Amino acid sequence: MVTKLEQLIAQTILQGFDAQYGRFLEVTAGAQHRFEQADWHAVQQAMKKRIHLYDSHVGLVVEQLKHITDQRCFDVNFLTRVKEIYTGLLPDYPRFEIAESFFNSVYCRLFKHRDLTPDKLFVFSSQPERRFREIPRPLARDFAPKGDLSGMLQVVLNDLPLRLPWENLPRDIGYIATALRQNFTDEQLATARFQVANELFYRNKAAWLVGKLRLADEVYPFLLPIHHNESGGLFIDTCLTSKAEASIVFGFARSYFMVYAPLPAAMVEWLREILPGKSTAELYMAIGCQKHGKTESYREYLTFVHQSSEQFIIAPGVKGMVMLVFTLPSFDRVFKVIKDQFAPQKEVSQTRVLECYQLVKEHDRVGRMADTQEYENFVIDKHRISAELLTELQREVPEKLEDLGDQIIIKHLYMERRMTPLNLYIEQANDQQLKDAIEEYGNAIKQLAAANIFPGDMLFKNFGVTRHGRVVFYDYDEICYMTEVNFRDIPPPRYPEDEMASEPWYSVSPNDVFPEEFRHFLCTDLKVRHFFEEMHSDLFHASYWRGLQQRIKDGHVEDVFAYRRKQRFSQRVIS
């Protein structure tokens, strides 16, 4: 029998989610103003604020429920009825899928991530799969060239909500039209239909027009990043029309977009067509619904495990001194557990490692740091764990294991996108691949540094290569802000004997870094040394790093491009 208390609990949770998502939309709606004001520090603050909203509102609801129930414990039947009532509130609810995740979060906070069974929380959704395949209201407007591509582009750009003047709109329209004609024939463009999202996608210092270019036999992305010039005028920086380029723009190593999406499921469905390689989890994360993205990641994991018979194995690559990393051979993610004891040379605590991972979650990842999802009390069937991995788990993380007989519980782990470790990639690379990898590695270091992130441990084993060939950092236990580091030149030796001594002839403080030393541990291979010296020798000079520090201290926020600089209209010759 359903009681008023059960109904009150269900309604309180849904009202709490309503409040959270209302604040989420409120912060998101401010993105246009922040962009128009070129208030880049406010952009960074809003990003962190929006990430914190979810956990904050979960905490508020948990306190409400403790007050309502007088902190009583309830039996299984009571909890099942609460979920049934909550499920009954969702069929006509516009954000049902995230409301389910919010319910899960409240349950987990109340019951310490214990007893996570489908009868008590939404392990899988209660609603029809992809309910918004037919979108209830238009998310985009349609445009057709009708023999005048430039005229159509002018209508599209003049229709944008931005209130700033264009630097040179006819020039940009010419650039876009030329770029389109370089990728598509006149016959294709003559019958093309363009769909442009009603809302702009804001991230970093850009506002992205996101659209689709529909041809008779295929749909392509149509992406235009809009930037400021120094005088406050707007300009289009490039035109991207390949699905590979779109995948990088919406990549897992980038900050979440701010896009006004009162119907997030509908937005995800609309994006799916131009991002076919992205999972549902990745699409939700891309639009800022990272907690529901975590739910979808777990569901994707459960589906994979159910459909395969693979065993969990130790992840390929050099074993970490702080993290134990394992995976499934065909799964596109890895699982990372903080070891109970670290290698002696690692002067870091477990608390500090947790702080580092949270820092990455909240910071601008500039396309160079992999996003992670954090789980507690992660259950794995023991027969799915290889003997080697089980031994490793029992040796390295016994304090984080709970043995249930046929299953084990890992009390805390991170799930992260799987990549090819850079050191393994380099070992197998041909000369061109090696050159590209070193160029990417150096660019990753420089872009992280410009965003006020110093990786700490810069060895190749701490970086991965994505399927698009991008180099991404993924080992965060020594990460810190650039402004916390003291970059020093190595003093000249006092005597010839100094260079032969086992100890340095100069004092070294905890935050001291000597970039000259990077050459010794990064360039042991002669080919690597050659490419490094050719493209990134500035990384070996303390003056380079101090210059970046000064720009950060001066309040400068660097541009972040989700495409190669040579693709910028200002960098390439439009023929």
Swiss-Prot record:
ATP binds at residues 315-321, 336. One of its GO terms (cellular component) is cytoplasm. It catalyses: L-seryl-[isocitrate dehydrogenase] + ATP = O-phospho-L-seryl-[isocitrate dehydrogenase] + ADP + H(+). Pfam families: AceK_kinase (PF06315), AceK_regulatory (PF20423). Keywords: ATP-binding, Cytoplasm, Glyoxylate bypass, Hydrolase, Kinase, Nucleotide-binding, Protein phosphatase, Serine/threonine-protein kinase, Transferase, Tricarboxylic acid cycle. One of its GO terms (biological process) is glyoxylate cycle. Transmembrane segments: none annotated. GO terms for molecular function: [isocitrate dehydrogenase (NADP+)] kinase activity; AMP binding; ATP binding; phosphoprotein phosphatase activity; protein serine/threonine kinase activity. It is found in: Cytoplasm. The keyword ATP-binding applies. Its EC number is 2.7.11.5, 3.1.3.-. It comes from the Bacteria. The active site is at residue 371. Belongs to the AceK family. Bifunctional enzyme which can phosphorylate or dephosphorylate isocitrate dehydrogenase (IDH) on a specific serine residue. This is a regulatory mechanism which enables bacteria to bypass the Krebs cycle via the glyoxylate shunt in response to the source of carbon. When bacteria are grown on glucose, IDH is fully active and unphosphorylated, but when grown on acetate or ethanol, the activity of IDH declines drastically concomitant with its phosphorylation. This is Isocitrate dehydrogenase kinase/phosphatase. The lineage of its organism: Bacteria, Pseudomonadati, Pseudomonadota, Gammaproteobacteria, Enterobacterales.
